[in-house]
A protein has these predicted regions:
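Hydrophobic core residues within well-ordered beta-strands of beta-rich domains
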Residues: 12-14, 70, 143
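Core domains of carbohydrate- and sulfate-ester-processing enzymes
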Residues: 72, 76, 80-131
């Protein structure tokens, strides 16, 4: 079955599924997927289908270049007409218009996009491991931390994070 987030299909198409239910049990009235491929515009072909039994908006799209990265957002709305733009909470890549400008090599934030932007690529490049002899003793006994240096340390760099390794070790 389809999972929430980005689903890569065997035929090269991609299915997007977005859970939409708030604490009061309400959902938005419509959802469109907007992105690089449709100039960030709300178009009929980006209108997502509603599955009320799963509280999920979904759509399957094709025609993507498998080796190209595409950026997108979900554009949700209600009868009030005020749309909300959100990234996919399950995405592996997020572009941030407020912070990415300070990071070398990150593409310019797309015109027409708002807030955080998700990205996907069908043929994702394989990560080039630097230490090929690394072995995990017990993958069920791992503690993995993900850290954004600029938010974790006042110096905003790896040296500042390394100075805090005792703190991280004390976390467990």
């Amino acid at each position: 079955g389809v999972k929430h987030g980005i689903n890569y299909n065997a035929d090269g198409s991609v299915t997007f599924a977005f859970y939409d239910k708030d604490t009061a049990g309400s959902s938005h009235k419509y959802c469109y997927i907007v992105g690089d491929w449709n100039n960030w515009e709300r178009k009929t072909e980006g209108s997502m289908y509603w599955d009320g039994s799963q509280y999920c908006w979904w759509i399957t799209l094709d025609g993507f270049d498998a080796d190209k990265e595409y950026r997108f957002q979900y554009r949700l709305g209600n009868a009030s007409g005020a749309d909300t733009f959100v990234s996919d909470p399950y995405t592996e890549i997020v572009y941030d218009q407020w912070n990415d400008q300070y990071i070398d090599g990150v593409p310019a934030f797309p015109e027409g996009a708002k807030a955080l932007v998700s990205a996907f690529q069908i043929n994702k490049p394989e990560y080039a491991w630097k230490h090929k002899d690394f072995k995990v003793e017990d993958k069920n006994d791992l503690v993995i931390y993900e850290m954004l240096f600029r938010d974790f340390t006042t110096s905003h760099d790896i040296e500042g994070a390394m100075a805090q390794l005792d703190y991280i070790q004390n976390l467990g």
